[in-house]
Design a protein with these regions (language model features):
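Conserved SGNH/GDSL esterase-like catalytic core that processes O-acyl groups on lipids
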Residues: 33-38, 44-132, 166-169
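Active-site beta-alpha turn of Rossmann-fold NAD(P)-dependent dehydrogenases/reductases
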Residues: 41, 76, 151, 190
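Active-site segments of SGNH/GDSL-like serine hydrolases
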Residues: 110-114, 138-169
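Extended, non-globular alpha-helical segments
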Residues: 132-138
């Protein structure tokens, strides 16, 4: 009897170790400890310009909103592009490797702002292909994450080459197309995040503290509506 009980315990433990694909909040009866959320993005995700990005960036605020049972990882890198042919491709960075090795249950992708720069957007014919490659790579993870694609927020900075007309009229529609094509989840920040300069730093690109909170609220509400 003792031998049988031991075998049953070992079997249950082995099942728990294999259950990496859960994307619901875990309770005390679950095999999961936490729901892992990876936030992939550029400087807006990293928290550029904020006094305390570790607590004020939108991933940090999202962690506070989700609370216990969730682990949010900020994988943002300033100035990076979705385009692999851009000047600073995100997929060349350590944070991309970290996001994959994190084996997230939920992935939030917020890229595209830096792709709007003329020297990057000249490769626009590669945008859908490169984004699809990122989606396919994430879908192949053993954790089988839910993937949220975000359209970029309104941003404009002539000196940096960031063009809101390209973001709104070209990049955002392509992100929506990819959502439909892959049957993934959309967070349409280009529409949901107010086009209000009071929510941005003086550079016209990066959210201030209030903007970061608003961004986190929108993303939290979408996760809550679709996952919890």
């Amino acid at each position: 009897m003792k031998k049988l009980s031991l075998l049953l315990i070992m079997f249950v433990l082995s099942l728990c170790s294999m259950a990496q694909g859960c994307n619901k909040k875990c309770d005390s009866d679950s095999c999961c400890d936490v729901v892992r959320v990876a936030c992939i993005g550029n400087s807006i995700t990293e928290g550029f310009g904020l006094a305390f990005p570790s607590s004020q960036s939108w991933p940090a605020v999202l962690q506070q909103m989700l609370g216990e049972g969730f682990e949010v990882k900020n994988c943002g890198v300033s100035a990076r592009t979705l385009l692999n042919s851009g000047d600073l491709p995100y997929t060349k960075e350590k944070q991309w490797r970290d996001a994959k090795s994190f084996l997230p249950n939920i992935v939030i992708i917020k890229l595209g702002t830096n792709d709007s720069k003329p020297w990057n957007w000249k490769h626009k014919e590669d945008f859908v292909r490169d984004y699809q490659l990122m989606i396919d790579t994430l879908k192949a993870l053993s954790s089988h994450p839910s993937i949220y694609l975000c359209t970029p927020i309104h941003s404009e900075n002539v000196e940096w080459g960031i063009r809101d007309s390209v973001i709104t009229n070209e990049i955002a529609p392509l992100v929506r197309l990819l959502v439909r094509r892959n049957k993934q989840k959309l967070i349409d920040l280009n529409i949901l995040f107010p086009n209000d300069k009071n929510l941005l730093l003086d550079d016209g690109v990066h959210p201030n503290v209030d903007g970061s909170k608003r961004l986190a609220e929108i993303i939290y509400n979408e996760i809550k509506r679709k996952e919890l």
